[in-house]
Amino acid sequence: MSTGSNTKRYETPNHPYQGERIAQEGDLLGRYGLKNKEELWRTQSELREYRREARRLIGEAQGDVSVAEALGEEFLDRLRRYGILSADDDISKVLGLDVSDILERRLQTIVYRQGLASTPKQARQFIVHEHITVNGARVTRPSKMVEETEANAIAFDENSPLADSLHPARAEGQE
């Protein structure tokens, strides 16, 4: 018997072929360097859970946003900690979030945006090959959600050959 849960952490689309949806998914896969559509669907399911929780809190508060925020303080703090919401956003902003808001907080995307890699796929490779550290600890999961406080602590591992600024694979050296 295997350990762990055998449940899927995502939902597949209801209709197998919708040209517009497939084109949008392909664009997101390329823009964020995702390995396959399962990663995208997992992120979409995560966003769906956020929206569902926000709707539940607003419903419990009978539409009063300030009461809903008090009920869901931990939920909103978590979204603010990850940088999905800014400090002055209220709970109704959660309903307007897009999947790209979640994808922007992945370690892979942040490594690329900070200029440590020249492409999103190269950022993924650097992470998987243990060249990237967050707060001094190696991270090998490109899908790790990065907190706002951790974003400035992303760097190359000191033992990595990529720590040398003259390394040919470094994004800064290619300019």
UniProtKB/Swiss-Prot annotation:
Stretch forming the signal peptide: none
Single GO MF annotation: rRNA binding
One Pfam family, short name: S4
CDD domains: S4 (cd00165)
Gene3D superfamilies (UniProt xref): RNA-binding S4 domain
Domain of life of the organism encoding this protein: Archaea
Domain named S4 RNA-binding: residues: 105-169
GO biological process, one term: ribosomal small subunit biogenesis
Keywords recorded for this protein, A-Z: Ribonucleoprotein, Ribosomal protein, RNA-binding, rRNA-binding
Job description of the protein: One of the primary rRNA binding proteins, it binds directly to 16S rRNA where it nucleates assembly of the body of the 30S subunit.
PANTHER family listed in its UniProt record: 30S 40S RIBOSOMAL PROTEIN, 40S RIBOSOMAL PROTEIN S9
Family classification: Belongs to the universal ribosomal protein uS4 family.
Quaternary data: Part of the 30S ribosomal subunit. Contacts protein S5. The interaction surface between S4 and S5 is involved in control of translational fidelity.
Name assigned to this protein: Small ribosomal subunit protein uS4
